[in-house]
Amino acid sequence: MPNGFNDWDGRSPLRTRITNSVHRGASLNDRLAEAIFRLQAQENRLAGSAARMQQHDKEMFDKCVRAQISKDNARAAMYANECAQIRKMAKVTLQCQMALEQAALRLETAREFGNIASMMAPVASVVKSVQGHITGIIPEVGYELAEIGEVLNNAVYDAGDSLGSDTGIQTSGEEAQRILTEANTLAEHRMQQHFPVLPTAPAPMAQKATEQGFQ
């Protein structure tokens, strides 16, 4: 799984380049409003995906329990393995959902109180990290986040120019990590709430599914 804050390789698609060229003429506030709207849309998509994963996990969990009751250990282990894989994807999806929720909230606060330049840089870093993590699970969300990231990066650049200074690279990195850490904590809590402990499962796989987070 890609690590956060790696450079996004690959050329921006034509639609992204055209969209960004148009957006560069829009006001900073308008671009911020669009970024918030698009982030919330992707957050909702991830919430829907997480709900479907939870439902699928419940079905596999119930089959695992029934197989264990009937002493069909091989089948119980098979269903437990399937649950472990679902939970691994579900946790990443929840982490990404929580990170986008936190990012959108930060942008809304910045828009409300005018602290736009200092907040867009860490949000852009968060979006880049989330994109790297989610692309392998839900590619269409990853592609959309790549475009949102381009919009945010251009806005960060323009905001820095308008203020005649940079946006604080060290500070923005610390704030981005804070957002991701909060997302990990929230996702862990959601996992404990909605995914019951497996009655039987290969321990290494189950443990790996619960320990992964943003790196």
Feature-to-residue mapping (PLM):
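Extended, amphipathic, non-transmembrane alpha-helical segments
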Residues: 52-60
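Acidic, metal/ion-handling microdomains and their immediate structural contexts
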Residues: 48, 52, 69
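Solenoid-repeat scaffolds in large eukaryotic assemblies
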Residues: 75-77
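Residue-level recognition of alpha-helical coiled-coils
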Residues: 62, 69, 95, 102, ...
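Long C-terminal interaction segments enriched in charged/acidic composition
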Residues: 1-48, 117-215
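Amphipathic alpha-helical coiled-coil segments
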Residues: 86-106, 137
